[in-house]
Swiss-Prot record:
Protein name from the UniProt record: Xanthocillin biosynthesis cluster protein D
TM region(s), chain numbering: 131-153
Function: Part of the gene cluster that mediates the biosynthesis of the isocyanide xanthocillin and its derivatives. The first step of the pathway consists in the conversion of tyrosine into a vinyl-isonitrile intermediate by the isocyanide synthase xanB. Subsequent oxidative dimerization of this intermediate to form xanthocillin may involve the cytochrome P450 monooxygenase xanG, whose expression is coregulated with that of XanB.
InterPro entries (alphabetical): TMEM205-like, Xanthocillin_Biosynth-Assoc
Keyword line: Glycoprotein, Membrane, Transmembrane, Transmembrane helix
Main location: membrane
Pathway, per record: Secondary metabolite biosynthesis
Membrane topology: Single-pass membrane protein
Glycosylated residue positions: 107, 120
Subcellular localization, as worded in the UniProt entry: Membrane
Alphabetized Pfam families for the sequence: DUF4149
Native source species: Aspergillus fumigatus (strain ATCC MYA-4609 / CBS 101355 / FGSC A1100 / Af293)
Length: 156
């Protein structure tokens, strides 16, 4: 019973769970959910679904990064002061997620061909940027897994 109480009061299990949720969410959204929806839905419905899913996904991503940072053992976020470079991947994930959250899409309905062409160009640019930011976040999340493993192997 004592061992369970010590574990429950330790940051490590919460840190591992939040990091695992972050990595799992990124992998699932990037490689499973988007691919299946793209293949199964007509384009109009796929785009409508993505407009609803992605903002929630990016908010969850940022929230999980914060949760991962504040549960870093042994001293919460202050633990990064001892190993400042361990925070770099999480900062990268947080920044890329926040940038994706900040992208605003104009949903106004217009029939002006020039405005439609400009909106399509803006959407294409934002979509490409979002894909690249998500790839950077995924690489940074895996990178953090290796820095965390190194810290655990060296006794934090």
């Amino acid at each position: 019973m004592q061992a369970i109480l010590e574990t429950v009061s330790n940051l490590l299990p919460y840190h591992l769970l939040s990091y695992g949720a972050l990595l799992g969410t990124e992998l699932f959204q990037s490689f499973v959910n988007t691919k299946i929806c793209y293949q199964a839905l007509p384009m109009k419905e796929f785009l409508a679904l993505q407009k609803r899913v992605f903002p929630a996904y990016f908010r969850c991503q940022v929230g999980l990064v914060v949760l991962t940072a504040v549960t870093r053992p042994p001293y919460s976020i202050l633990s990064f002061s001892q190993h400042i470079w361990d925070s770099v991947p999480l900062i990268a994930v947080g920044v890329t997620g926040a940038l994706n959250c900040a992208m605003n899409e104009d949903n106004s309905s217009t029939t002006d061909p020039a405005k439609i062409q400009q909106a399509n160009k803006t959407f294409s640019r934002n979509h490409a940027m979002s894909i690249h930011l998500n790839a950077i976040a995924l690489v940074a999340t895996v990178w953090y897994g290796f820095t965390l493993s190194s810290s655990l192997l060296n006794g934090l």
